[in-house]
Amino acid sequence: MAKVNLEQIEHAVRLILEAIGDDPNREGVLDTPRRVAKMYAEVFSGMHEDPKEHLHKVFGEDHEELVLVKDIPFYSMCEHHLVPFYGVAHVAYIPRGGKVTGLSKLARTVDTIARRPQLQERITSTVADSIMEVLEPHGVMVVVEAEHMCMTMRGVKKPGAKTVTTAVRGVLENDAAARSEILSFIKSK
């Protein structure tokens, strides 16, 4: 996949400024095309990374019980409106065969997947599927909570409304008690 074309983004932003009736040569917005291009390169940096690469660093640890990293902050851009949504991800897995990854690797996986034009549902599923594929755990559960600016500042205009999505894989799919335990850990402070 090609890297971000900063010049093309700058040109497009100038066209947008003109299309909304602003003067792209006005002092206040003169550098806006460059700033937006740099921002897009940053917020869409996940387009050029494989999130699974983070998970390949494993430690041989004889632990086959729950590992949960909760309240992982993330931001993304809604692929429908190109406006932000942001929130927290909670990632739980039950290791198998001594394959335990670094805790920061779970957060990096979330970030890489979120830093593309996205849907919250896809972030949730892709995080779970990536962990299942690379770590081959007994089970995975991912819960994502987010506020979407496309619902806050346009359309229905409901600030504060949160969307919650889940993805459950492996043994956790049929174990309601384990899912409840994970949810209780997520809710605890």
UniProtKB/Swiss-Prot annotation:
Could you tell me the superkingdom of the organism this chain comes from?
A: Bacteria
User: What EC numbers are recorded for this enzyme?
Assistant: 3.5.4.16
Q: In which pathway does it act?
A: Cofactor biosynthesis; 7,8-dihydroneopterin triphosphate biosynthesis; 7,8-dihydroneopterin triphosphate from GTP: step 1/1
A Gene Ontology biological process in which this protein takes part is: tetrahydrofolate biosynthetic process
Q: Which Gene3D superfamilies match?
A: 1.10.286.10, 3.30.1130.10
Annotated GO MF terms:
GTP binding; GTP cyclohydrolase I activity; zinc ion binding
GO CC aspect terms = cytoplasm
Q: Name one Pfam family in it.
A: GTP_cyclohydroI
InterPro entries given in the database record:
GTP-CH-I_C/QueF (IPR043133), GTP-CH-I_N (IPR043134), GTP_CycHdrlase_I (IPR001474), GTP_CycHdrlase_I_CS (IPR018234), GTP_CycHdrlase_I_dom (IPR020602)
Q: Which reaction does it catalyse?
A: GTP + H2O = 7,8-dihydroneopterin 3'-triphosphate + formate + H(+)
Binding positions for Zn(2+) per the UniProt entry? 78, 81, 150
Q: Which PROSITE patterns match?
A: GTP_CYCLOHYDROL_1_1, GTP_CYCLOHYDROL_1_2
Describe its assembly.
Homomer.
Q: Which family does it belong to?
A: Belongs to the GTP cyclohydrolase I family.
What is the designated name of this protein? GTP cyclohydrolase 1
